[in-house]
């Protein structure tokens, strides 16, 4: 495994650990999710370029489209929660609260 692949795998692991450890605030969770999507995009692009599999060159673009949709939904959810409760805690997303 080359140094570039190890760095990308490490970046994905750090983003995943950040998502698991700092899950109290919605903004930090969204940032970790975006970091994971960015590393998946870079890893997919590098793999496609290394294998010369040009038929799959559209897959990273599709991943970016889904990442943009996820970011838009996440930010709208963040705005809704912060306007309703005044804070961006993930525990405020529980619909079973009274």
Swiss-Prot record:
InterPro entries: NADH_UbQ_OxRdtase_chain4L/K, NUOK/Mnh_C1-like
Subcellular compartments: Mitochondrion inner membrane
GO CC entries: mitochondrial inner membrane; respiratory chain complex I
GO biological process, one term: ATP synthesis coupled electron transport
Keyword flag Translocase: yes
Keyword Membrane included in the entry's annotation: yes
Domain of life, per lineage: Eukaryota
GO molecular function: NADH dehydrogenase (ubiquinone) activity
EC numbers on record: 7.1.1.2
Protein function: Core subunit of the mitochondrial membrane respiratory chain NADH dehydrogenase (Complex I) which catalyzes electron transfer from NADH through the respiratory chain, using ubiquinone as an electron acceptor. Part of the enzyme membrane arm which is embedded in the lipid bilayer and involved in proton translocation.
Name by which UniProt lists this protein: NADH-ubiquinone oxidoreductase chain 4L
Lineage start: Eukaryota, Metazoa, Chordata, Craniata, Vertebrata
